[in-house]
Amino acid sequence: MTRSLKKNPFVANHLLEKVEKLNMREEKKIIVTWSRSSTIIPTMIGHTIAIHNGREHLPIYITDRMVGHKLGEFAPTLTFRGHARNDNRSRR
């Protein structure tokens, strides 16, 4: 179910403050965050945000096509290592 249109998109306060501060200074630094549930808003375009995936922070450059999506969508938490091998030879 999607978020109600009456509500504003969720962005963590600390993340929003960091983005606004960098926009005021016109700096481009990497912003480190654990807030995967924050929505990408237009003021974040052009910044690099390091999103935590449970093990490390992955730097993601924010473009205009990402607006409206959540930060966690761009930092996968699982690594697929392949299906289990079918070991019929060793069972004989």
Swiss-Prot record:
GO MF annotations, alphabetized: rRNA binding; structural constituent of ribosome
Principal subcellular localisation of the protein: plastid
Sorted UniProt keywords: Chloroplast, Plastid, Ribonucleoprotein, Ribosomal protein, RNA-binding, rRNA-binding
Family: Belongs to the universal ribosomal protein uS19 family.
PANTHER family xref list: RIBOSOMAL PROTEIN S19P FAMILY MEMBER, SMALL RIBOSOMAL SUBUNIT PROTEIN US19M
Superkingdom: Eukaryota
Example of a GO cellular component annotation carried by this entry: chloroplast
Keyword Mitochondrion set for record: no
Natural source organism: Chloranthus spicatus (Chulantree)
Function as written in the Swiss-Prot or TrEMBL entry: Protein S19 forms a complex with S13 that binds strongly to the 16S ribosomal RNA.
HAMAP family xrefs: Ribosomal_uS19
Gene from which this protein is expressed: rps19
Pfam families: Ribosomal_S19 (PF00203)
Subcellular location per the Swiss-Prot or TrEMBL entry: Plastid, Chloroplast
Protein name according to UniProt: Small ribosomal subunit protein uS19c
GO biological process: ribosomal small subunit assembly; translation
Lineage of source species: Eukaryota, Viridiplantae, Streptophyta, Embryophyta, Tracheophyta
